[in-house]
């Protein structure tokens, strides 16, 4: 099971997450309490192992700006959390991830219409797109087609206490955590370590 730690804002957390076995790190360029500047993201990314995915998170940003930041920072993927459509997705010259809020089983059908490399299933959107720390009913995704499951990233309120049930129910390709590895709004490296250990253990 692959693990993505999202909302990275400092070098130390990024390096420790990689040491503990994170497969991907997320950098938020949209409005969020975890927003990072392209300059700082570039500094961090330059120090990371080549095999770790570096994913930029955007919300309704222009294709030109997404591409500019991706090239400048050395991103490997971009994650689209807004109302982006296939026309915009096709214009991107970088692998992409489309985020969808889950409210019913029909969201699986909607997801298959997007021409992206991965689909990230998250809790329904609130003030900020993602990172709200709230779960949704994983049972809604329990019967997805194999071809969709193989490109599914599961997010939304995950933590070390509920990750086993989430993985058992959805069986995604990757899990994505942000607020579930924080203490008082800041990334907690011990929680990151425990989340990664638990995820890898229960997906063997």
UniProtKB/Swiss-Prot annotation:
Query: Which keywords accompany this UniProt record?
Result: Amino-acid biosynthesis, Aromatic amino acid biosynthesis, Isomerase, Tryptophan biosynthesis
Q: Which family does it belong to?
A: Belongs to the TrpF family.
Pathway where this protein functions: Amino-acid biosynthesis; L-tryptophan biosynthesis; L-tryptophan from chorismate: step 3/5
Which E.C. number(s) belong to this protein? Answer: 5.3.1.24
Catalytic activities:
N-(5-phospho-beta-D-ribosyl)anthranilate = 1-(2-carboxyphenylamino)-1-deoxy-D-ribulose 5-phosphate
Principal EC category: isomerase
Organism superkingdom: Bacteria
Does the record carry Lyase as a key word? Answer: no
One GO term (biological process): L-tryptophan biosynthetic process
Where does the chain cross the membrane? Answer: none
Instruction: Check the record and name the HAMAP family matching this protein.
Output: PRAI (MF_00135)
InterPro entries the UniProt entry points to: Aldolase_TIM (IPR013785), PRAI_dom (IPR001240), RibuloseP-bd_barrel (IPR011060), TrpF_fam (IPR044643)
Q: Return the protein name.
A: N-(5'-phosphoribosyl)anthranilate isomerase
GO molecular function ontology, one term from the record: phosphoribosylanthranilate isomerase activity
């Amino acid at each position: 099971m692959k693990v993505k730690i999202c909302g990275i804002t400092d070098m130390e957390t990024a390096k420790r997450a990689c040491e503990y076995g994170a497969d991907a790190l997320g950098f938020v360029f949209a409005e969020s309490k975890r927003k990072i500047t392209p300059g700082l993201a570039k500094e961090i990314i330059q120090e990371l192992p080549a095999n770790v995915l570096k994913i930029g998170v955007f919300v309704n940003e222009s294709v030109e700006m997404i591409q500019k930041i991706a090239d400048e920072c050395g991103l490997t993927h971009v994650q689209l959390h807004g109302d982006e459509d296939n026309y915009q997705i096709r214009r991107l010259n970088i692998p992409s991830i489309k985020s969808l809020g889950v409210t019913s089983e029909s969201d699986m059908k909607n997801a298959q219409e997007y021409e992206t490399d991965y689909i990230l299933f998250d809790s329904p959107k609130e003030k900020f797109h993602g990172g709200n720390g709230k779960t949704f009913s994983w049972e809604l995704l329990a019967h997805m087609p194999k071809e969709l499951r193989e490109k599914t990233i599961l997010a939304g309120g995950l933590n070390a206490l509920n990750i086993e049930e989430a993985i058992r129910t959805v069986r995604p390709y990757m899990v994505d955590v942000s607020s579930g590895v924080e203490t008082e709004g800041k990334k907690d490296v011990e929680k990151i370590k425990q989340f990664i250990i638990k995820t890898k253990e229960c997906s063997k």
